């Protein structure tokens, strides 16, 4: 069984273009925005596949619907926002679409502080991912349970 781990300090994250591709594989219509907070207002800029994060503090939002406007204050009703949650915890690291995305994009699947690597463990094993400041390792076996 293949699983995806992050093998550098920083954290598990997909690059923007890899994230868009993964959404496409899953049949999710996605609208991506660069979000910046100033005082009590969020400013948004629509981004496409060519966008590359230039620093770790940039925040990209993946939404199910287009935003009706490019500025939203904290006092407004935000109920219309539907974030796309690509959960990369636990068993989801063996997700076939995630593995395919990392295989296809290779190094381009990595943003600034990730080095995604596909590792193989014997089929039928449970696994637990251990993380130290973003750097991950895996323990696998039968009936691992929870500690």
Language-model regions, residue ranges each:
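Catalytic phosphate/metal-binding cores of nucleic-acid and nucleotide-processing enzymes, i.e., regions
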Residues: 1-147
């Amino acid at each position: 069984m293949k699983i995806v781990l992050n093998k550098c300090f920083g954290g598990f994250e997909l690059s923007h273009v890899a994230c868009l591709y993964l959404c496409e594989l899953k049949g999710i219509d996605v609208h991506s925005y660069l979000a910046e907070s100033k005082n009590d207002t969020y400013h948004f800029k629509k981004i496409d596949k060519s966008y590359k994060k230039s620093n770790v503090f940039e925040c990209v939002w993946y939404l199910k619907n287009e935003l009706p406007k490019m500025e939203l204050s904290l006092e407004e009703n935000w109920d219309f926002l539907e974030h796309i949650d690509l959960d990369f915890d636990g068993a989801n690291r063996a997700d076939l679409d995630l593995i395919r995305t990392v295989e296809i994009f290779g190094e381009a699947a990595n943003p600034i502080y990730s080095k995604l690597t596909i590792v193989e463990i014997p089929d039928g094993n449970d696994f637990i991912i251990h993380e130290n400041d973003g750097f991950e390792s895996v323990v696998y076996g039968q009936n691992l349970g929870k500690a």
